[in-house]
Amino acid sequence: MSKTDKIPSHVAIIMDGNGRWARARGLERHEGHRAGVNSLRNVIARAARNPGVRYLTLYVFSTENWGRPQEEVDMLMELLCRSIVNELDELLREQVKVVVIGERAGMSKTVVEHIELIERETAACTELTILLCINYSSRGELTRAARRLAEKAVSGELSPAEITPETIAGELYTGGIPDPDL
C-alpha cells in the first residue's frame, strides 16, 4: 500500500450545510437536517466496517448554534434524542462506542439523559469510537484545559514549568485519542 493509500485512523466531519442543501432543493431546513442524519448513518456504517478507522469525530452542534432560532434548536435537540434511540441497537451490533464531548451545562435534562444513555450503553464497544461534539467549541475546550492546569498549578500538583503541549493535550476532551487525520 502506498503512502497515499493509507487509511486514516481518525476521521473528523463538520456537519454543516444541511439547511443550504434543503433550501437548494426547495425543502424546509428540518428536512435537510433529517437528510444529514441519513447520510451520517451510511458514513458510520462504512467507518465501522473499515478496520483502519478507529475514531470518527462528528461536529454536531457548536456553542454558536444556540444562536439559531429557538424552533430550529428545539428540532435539532429532538432529532438528536430520536437518533440516539433509533440508532442504539445498530451501534451496539456494530460495536460502536459513543463519547460525547462538549459542555452539558445549558442542555435540557432530556438531552443529557439521552447522551448519558448512549455513552453508558456503548461503553464496552471496541470496533469504532465516535466522538460527538455537542455544545462544543475549541475555545471552550482550551479554556477548560487551561483552567484545569491552572488549578493544578495553584494546588502545587504541577509547576508552571511542567505545562507542555502534552500536559495540555491530556486535559482536552480528546486526551489519549490521536488527532484527526482528515
Language model segments and positions:
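Flexible, compositionally biased loop and terminal segments
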Residues: 1-182
